[in-house]
Amino acid sequence: MDYLRAQVPGGELVSASPQEISPTVKRVVDDLAPHPTFVRTASMDIIYWNTAATEKIFDWSTLHVEQRNSLLLMFGYDGYQQRIENRGCAARHTVASFRTTFALSKSKARFSEILTALSASSAFQTLWQEMHVEKIGQGEKVIRNARGEQVNYRYVSLEVENSPGIFVICYLAM
């Protein structure tokens, strides 16, 4: 556990709802357009996004609130999976990041719901058994937009200060 705590400054995480995102954070996300940017909780629920994210990555508004989760989409929604090139690498990273925030979270209820929903996925179970941990951090990803065009992105995940478990993730086209 000490290793995990060292990976995420600030210690334990809590989950948040869209109502708990400050107007300032929402404005920052909106003003980052044309760069796809969204807000994600420690449990990987997508709770806010800008129009560029809808147009260039995915339209989360088409899903019920409880389905707007990066991990659930990665392993259970073909329309989302087909957009991500090198899905295996992206899935491994997402599972490792989820494991880290799960271990650090004060509230396990949402994490448990997600784990239960993914229990039938053999692909998820294989990665979960690897016991790998890491932070979202920054990296590169290739995403196909709604028109099928392949776009190379660099992304960065930034935790909102004084809002443990709230991350702003911004994608910059390369």
PLM feature spans:
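Short amphipathic recognition helices of helix-turn-helix/homeodomain-type DNA-binding modules
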Residues: 1-20
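Hydrophobic protein-protein interaction segments
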Residues: 18, 23-174
